[in-house]
Curated annotation (Swiss-Prot):
Substrate binds at residues 135-136, 274, 283, 292. NCBIfam families: pdxA (TIGR00557). Belongs to the PdxA family. It catalyses: 4-(phosphooxy)-L-threonine + NAD(+) = 3-amino-2-oxopropyl phosphate + CO2 + NADH. GO terms for molecular function: 4-hydroxythreonine-4-phosphate dehydrogenase activity; cobalt ion binding; magnesium ion binding; NAD binding; zinc ion binding. This is 4-hydroxythreonine-4-phosphate dehydrogenase. Catalyzes the NAD(P)-dependent oxidation of 4-(phosphooxy)-L-threonine (HTP) into 2-amino-3-oxo-4-(phosphooxy)butyric acid which spontaneously decarboxylates to form 3-amino-2-oxopropyl phosphate (AHAP). Pathway: Cofactor biosynthesis; pyridoxine 5'-phosphate biosynthesis; pyridoxine 5'-phosphate from D-erythrose 4-phosphate: step 4/5. It comes from Vibrio cholerae serotype O1 (strain ATCC 39315 / El Tor Inaba N16961). One of its GO terms (cellular component) is cytoplasm.
Length: 330
């Protein structure tokens, strides 16, 4: 199998993102990795961390080759101002967005086969005068994708969400038949096309305690979730199990058979995922016209430049991207 190109964005320059991408130089990789960041920032952070790495300028027209240990290809995006590890600077907010724009455009024009994103700081980007709610929404806008699905995965568990960063009080009204149907279609399609699962089995959480208990604890299951799932089963032959109570859906007897668990809201499924795989889980954006994976943690400003950052989630994100790229090439 020929090598592909994966672009890696370093995220917030004052956080641990630069530390994480520099750590990638410690080993060989089967595909070519292109780090999208300020080259001088990487050189400075490498010196701070005592990492010996050769930073090479990325040339699009050069042959695609597997990544060699001790080197990193860099697509240079200049910072607005110098960076001090651990100290946020709104002046560099636009720099972060430029790295994401470059990565998205490169994937959409076929230059890159996947994006792996380091952690960003939403607050400092907004303080720079840019309305930014996260990578997921940004890439959806860049690719003109009307609806995307957030998946978080770790070994033995894939979860996806019907609603994401929404106040809990607003969740019930956001779960409509139309939205649930769209989310299930995207999840099912990407499990087939990106994960190469021919007939995925999706387990679906109810919204209310005990999945509503026949309407005693809420009518959302009866009025919205159950009829939508039944319609999808009948029309498309999808294997959809549920709605099941969220307090039992994560039992081993279900997880052994589930290709993915669909939760209704953020904190319904993510505590289980992070308990099961903290530091080894990955965020995958479904529905985009390209592969995008990311760490499941923040910028950890207090660890930047210290050598104490845990690269587990970042390496897992890259491993998932490589797996999905390889499956796409088959």
């Amino acid at each position: 199998m020929s090598s592909k190109r994966i672009i890696v964005t370093a995220g917030e320059p004052a956080g641990i993102g630069p530390d994480l991408v520099l750590a990638l130089s410690a080993q060989d990789w089967p595909h070519q990795l292109v780090v999208c960041a300020d080259k001088a920032l990487l050189a400075q952070r490498a010196t701070q961390l005592g990492i010996q790495v050769k930073l090479l300028d990325y040339q699009r027209d050069n042959p695609v080759q597997a990544q060699q240990a001790g080197t990193l290809l860099v697509e240079h995006i200049p910072l607005a101002e110098p960076v001090v590890a651990g100290q946020l600077n709104p002046a560099n907010g636009h720099y972060v967005l430029k790295t994401l724009e470059r990565a998205a455009k490169g994937c959409m024009n076929g230059e890159f086969d996947a994006i792996v994103t380091g952690p960003v700081h939403k607050g400092v980007i907004n303080r720079a005068g840019v309305a930014f709610s996260g990578h997921t929404e940004f890439f959806a806008e860049q690719s003109k994708t009307p609806l995307v699905v957030m998946m978080l995965a770790t070994e033995g568990l894939r979860t996806a969400l019907v609603t994401t960063h929404l106040p809990l009080a607003e969740v019930p009204q956001a779960i409509t038949c139309e939205r649930l149907e769209q989310i299930v279609h995207i999840l099912h399609k990407d499990l087939v096309e990106k994960f190469a699962i021919a007939e995925p089995k999706i387990y679906v959480c109810g919204l209310n305690p005990h999945a509503g208990e026949d309407g005693v604890l809420g009518m959302d299951e009866i009025e919205t979730i159950t009829p939508t799932l039944q319609r999808l089963r009948e029309q498309y032959g999808m294997q959809l199990v549920g709605p099941l109570p969220a307090d039992t859906i994560f039992s081993e007897k279900y997880l052994q058979q589930a290709d993915a668990v669909l939760g209704m809201y953020h904190d319904q499924v993510l505590p289980v995922l992070k308990y099961k795989g903290f530091g080894r889980s990955v965020n995958i954006t479904l529905g985009l016209p390209f592969i995008r994976t990311s760490v499941d943690h923040g910028t950890a400003l207090d660890l930047a430049g210290t050598g104490q950052a845990d690269a587990g989630s970042f390496w897992t994100a890259l491993a998932y991207a490589i797996e999905l790229v390889d499956k796409k090439a088959q």
